[in-house]
Amino acid sequence: LKCNQLIPPFWKTCPKGKNLCYKMTMRGASKVPVKRGCIDVCPKSSLLIKYMCCNTDKCN
């Protein structure tokens, strides 16, 4: 997940209301993203799942 180094034309812009980009990965396999997209509030990471969030609405 790249927050500030946008690579045109592949970046994603999140809509209003869900204006944070995020990526969810499993703790043991951090190279494989499970899910990515837009969210309104960054979730807290747990023992099994790690969340990475941007503080912008644009990300790669």
From Swiss-Prot:
Stored InterPro entries: Cytotoxin_Cobra, Snake_3FTx, Snake_toxin-like_sf, Snake_toxin_con_site, Toxin_cobra-type
GO biological process: killing of cells of another organism
Domain of life (superkingdom): Eukaryota
GO MF annotation terms: toxin activity
CDD domains assigned to the protein according to its UniProt record, in alphabetical order: TFP_snake_toxin (cd00206)
Primary location: secreted
Entry comment describing in which tissues the protein is expressed: Expressed by the venom gland.
Keyword Protein biosynthesis: no
Keyword Kinase: no
Disulfide bonds: C3-C21, C14-C38, C42-C53, C54-C59
Assigned GO CC terms: extracellular region; membrane; other organism cell membrane
Subcellular compartments: Secreted; Target cell membrane
Keywords, ordered alphabetically: Cardiotoxin, Cytolysis, Disulfide bond, Membrane, Secreted, Target cell membrane, Target membrane, Toxin
Additional information: S-type are generally found to exhibit higher muscle cell depolarization than P-type.
Family: Belongs to the three-finger toxin family. Short-chain subfamily. Type IA cytotoxin sub-subfamily.
Summary of subunit composition and partner proteins: Monomer in solution; Homodimer and oligomer in the presence of negatively charged lipids forming a pore with a size ranging between 20 and 30 Angstroms.
Protein role: Shows cytolytic activity on many different cells by forming pore in lipid membranes. In vivo, increases heart rate or kills the animal by cardiac arrest. In addition, it binds to heparin with high affinity, interacts with Kv channel-interacting protein 1 (KCNIP1) in a calcium-independent manner, and binds to integrin alpha-V/beta-3 (ITGAV/ITGB3) with moderate affinity.
Name of the protein: Cytotoxin 2
Organism: Naja mossambica
